[in-house]
Design a protein with these regions (language model features):
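Pyridoxal 5′-phosphate
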Residues: 1-254
Length: 254
């Protein structure tokens, strides 16, 4: 039995789990978690923000009750996003805010809500952001998520091979089928912020710090890491640029 299912208690109302770690790139077996939770009648919310851009997503195969994505990680506008809600859960849920279009009838004493999903669409939505997200999703669909995954898997394997050749770099998260995310630290006292500054001077953008995951950093015994995240537009040649920049950083800092 997977660990989150073992943790279910009589008072457990919801399991929330990430599909893909934004730090390690590790893919979580969310289908197994959903199957186990279902035997206890506990709904599962899957955070697919980091996963949805890297692979095809099938919520029926996953078996989740909720699946959330953020637009800016799908090459859409910031402030946009979407959530899948299973029909059974949608029928159980009450509106969490009020506004236009979510009410069928209202008097001074009573209110009748529209049927789902409209009863959750209160007020004026982010029209521009939603249109922008739709365009981004059309673009991704046109490319084909399976094609994107194949390209990224090849790029991941090449990046792993190149990084493995740097014996002074430690990569966190080493599962073979991880997403195209590499968080790493450098031997000695080289801090992630210093490394990222040198990489920036060479035209390589990485994120340095705790990546909004303080508990994970504490578990790993680290104060910070650099994170290189590749996407559908990256190439093997750009991986080589990263490696060259890391070698320069190592020469300067270690």
């Amino acid at each position: 039995m997977v660990r989150p299912v073992k943790a279910i208690k009589p008072r457990t109302k919801l399991i929330a789990v990430t599909h893909c770690s934004n730090v390690l790139g590790t893919l979580v077996d969310v289908a197994a978690i959903c199957a186990g939770a279902r035997t206890y009648g506990v709904p599962v919310l899957v955070d697919g923000s980091q996963a949805a851009i890297h692979m095809p997503i099938n919520v029926e195969q996953i078996g989740c009750d909720f699946y959330a994505v953020t637009g800016h990680k799908l090459y859409g506008p910031s402030g946009s996003g979407a959530i899948y809600v299973h029909q059974d859960r949608m029928a159980e849920m009450r509106p969490f805010m009020g506004g236009g279009d979510m009410i069928r009838e209202v008097t001074r004493d009573t209110v009748i809500y529209n049927a789902a999903p409209m009863k959750f669409e209160a007020g004026t939505p982010g029209i521009v952001q939603t249109i922008g997200l739709g365009v981004a999703l059309d673009y991704l669909t046109g490319l084909g998520m399976a094609n994107i995954a194949a390209h990224e898997n090849q790029l991941r394997d090449y990046a792993r091979k190149r990084l493995d050749g740097l014996n002074w770099i430690t990569v966190q998260g080493t599962t073979p089928d991880k997403a195209l995310i590499f968080s790493f630290s450098m031997e000695g006292a080289a801090h992630a912020h210093d490394i990222s500054t040198i990489l920036d001077k060479k035209g390589v953008a990485v994120r340095a710090g705790q990546h909004c995951t303080g508990p994970l950093m504490a578990h790993l015994g680290l104060n910070a890491t650099c994170r290189a995240s590749f996407g559908l537009y990256n190439t093997n040649a750009e991986v080589d640029v990263l490696i060259d920049a890391l070698e320069l950083a190592h020469d300067l800092l270690c």
